[in-house]
Amino acid sequence: MNATRLFLGDRLGADRTGTDDPAPRRKRRPGKSPWRSPLAITGLVIIGVFLIAAIFASLISPEDPLAQKWPKYQSPSGEHWFGTDQLGRDILSRVIHGTRISLPLALLLVVLAMVIGTVLGAVAGYFGGWIDMIVMRCADLVLAFPAIILAMAVVAALGPNLTNAVLAVVIVSWPTYARVVRGLVLTLRQSDFVQADRLLGASGWRVLAVDLRPNLAGPVAVLAALDLGNAVLLLSGLSFLGLGAQPPAAEWGAMVNAGSANFDAWWVAVFPGAAILLSVLAFNFLGDTLRDALDPRTARAIRK
């Protein structure tokens, strides 16, 4: 009995001690958000500047981008900050208006490629069989060629214009989404929550739309963000080769092509080329930041 009282007394004393004077709890180290990194801030600022330029291009551009009323090949000055081109057009105004072509079209083709590739990859990965074989063989066929070469062939067959250039870039871009999504679906379809839903009588389309879609959103969003820079580069490359935007459109790739005819007037090609470079870098920074924010393993590494 005394032993029992002694034991209970010790336990109660320990409980009272723990209640009155709790053990010091280990402080949780605050995590560093990926969106506060210098690269993320730089990317967001650049993208924000380009978006403002695209929305308010008519208000902030100093001149009409198509007006030919100044001396040709005028070097950068206080009157024309980026100089003039071979037709006497203000390059700054053309670069600003170029955001209205490059950025919306890049976003459009990435959305199209993402939707097509995600749907085909999810269907191929979940149902398998002949559907999987056909989709993956088509994807392998597209990926067997360099993207720019295949895009050039498609535009050459359909005719050189901006619409066909967008279509060509979509054709060369969707297989990447299809392969990534297929791999994710092959892994997720063996998960317990998917098997449970199937046992309850859910159809394959319901499983894809309800169970798997939320798990695919993060990786697909990261891939799309990274693909925006590639889309800008491919569209500009096709326009540089004369297969995309046609004169007198103020498109960055076409402007670089115009400047390649006269290396003495370096500003004609340098400023639109710098716009391409900055936009590609900004979208890559955005994609990397989004990946770090959505990937728990990367987030833990950042907090360390």
Feature annotation, model-predicted:
Residues M1-G48, G287-K304:
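Transmembrane alpha-helical segments of polytopic membrane transport and secretion proteins
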Residues L143, V154-A157, V169, G183-V185, ...:
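Glycine-rich helix-loop "coupling/hinge" segments at transmembrane-helix boundaries
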Residues W81, D85, V115-I116, G125-S191, ...:
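Generic hydrophobic transmembrane alpha-helix motif, especially the helices
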Residues R100-I116, F145, A151, W205-G237, ...:
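Transmembrane alpha-helices
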Residues I91-Y126, S279:
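Transmembrane alpha-helix signature in integral membrane proteins
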Residues V169-V172, G218, V222-L228, W267-K304:
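C-terminal transmembrane helix and the adjacent membrane-cytosol boundary/short C-terminal tail
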Residues N2, F7, R11, D15, ...:
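Hydrophobic alpha-helical transmembrane segments of membrane transport/permease proteins
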